[in-house]
Amino acid sequence: MRVLFVSDVYFPRVNGVSTSIRTFRQDLGTCGVETLLVVPSYVQSGAPSGGGPPPDEPGILRVPSSGVPKDPEDRRMQWGGLNRVLSTIPRGQVDVVHIQTPFIAHYAAARFARRNGVPCVATYHTFFEEYLHHYVPVLPRSIGRYLARSFTRSQCADVQALIAPSDPMRDVLLEYGVSTPIHVLPTGLPADRFNPGIAERFRSEQGIPAGRPLVTYVGRVAHEKNIEFLVKVFVEVRKTVPKAMLVIAGEGPAREPLRQLVARLGLEKDVHFAGYLDRNTGLLDCYAAANVFVFASRTETQGLVLLEAMAQGAPVVSTAELGTRSVLKAGCGALVVEEQLQPFTAAVVQVLQDAALQSDLAERGRTYARTWSSAIMARRLAELYESLRVSPGAERAIA
């Protein structure tokens, strides 16, 4: 079976969608599913790497793209270029189309599926309602909610099946009035996420003294990730643990505003911006070095980063919103707290000061993370593809 993935983002752009696509592609291959991926080119000044796919990733077609205003990380595929690339795929060579993002990729991929008479599935990675609130703040929240819900219903009607990465995200779609069948299917963790990171190497490469307890965030440095709240928590944490350092690993549009906030607070020597880290070495080392991993995003459709932290034995303190509620189960190796300054601060301080608690959370977290096998998730996705191919209008629910 051959499945066409179409996405508005992919590596070298680092985010959850890129990670999900790569993880599923790797594991689907062992299920007898060949994937072809159509994504933007990233040939631009200052890009993390060139526009072509890395040598170990065959089956990628890059589309000419242009910059996105006020967003140097992302690229916008050219409509004509995207359709020209899709037109090179011979009719009958694709069994299922899988849309990964809701922008130009969605409309071109849905059109391709209709013209070729093949079923189409989409993964709902992005919680638009909250994103609109952060990126178009002048828009009244009620209007933003109406627009997000109308837009979502319209796009979901274009496909024969939907994938929600978590139960709460499925519930949101049902509340919107989406009638397309919804299947809950998280990405899962590939086996290499459990390769042990080297904490000492991270500290050495980043110039961080061995004696400083690390309060660590990993992810996109964007306003919707609620990192400003974590900075406020850190200010309070230092009153009890003055040697603590906040590590922010990642890039994004909120990096400069956060740097300015840190400067105003006089914390330049206590907050370390690590930037992008190599996924196979630096990122694992970063997790391994964390004395406590903190997270307070309101927009996660899954919260895969929490599982990655647990896989490396990082004790987690986090809020539980949307997709992270599905990850943060009882006994999972995390302290779950409300988004309130004092309770969150108290939980972080408790972990930093209690070595036995750190060890217990680390052990339980590693054990729990292993239950989220990406290979199992890929088999379930392959079953969905097969049911769509056999009977596009009557796919069965995946187990």
Predicted feature residues:
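Aromatic "clamp/platform" in nucleotide-sugar-dependent glycosyltransferases that forms part
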Residues: 298
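Conserved acidic donor-binding segment of nucleotide-sugar-dependent glycosyltransferases
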Residues: 330-341, 350-355
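Short hydrophobic beta-strand element within catalytic cores of glycosyltransferases
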Residues: 315-319
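Nucleotide-activated donor-binding/catalytic signature segment of Leloir-type glycosyltransferases, i.e.
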Residues: 256-277
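Short alpha-helical donor nucleotide-sugar binding micro-motif in glycosyltransferases
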Residues: 276, 284-290
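N-terminal subdomain of nucleotide-sugar transferases
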Residues: 1-64, 90, 397-399
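A short helix/loop element that forms part of the nucleotide-sugar donor recognition site in Leloir-type
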Residues: 195-208, 394
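Conserved donor-binding/catalytic core segment of Leloir-type glycosyltransferases
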Residues: 209-234, 247
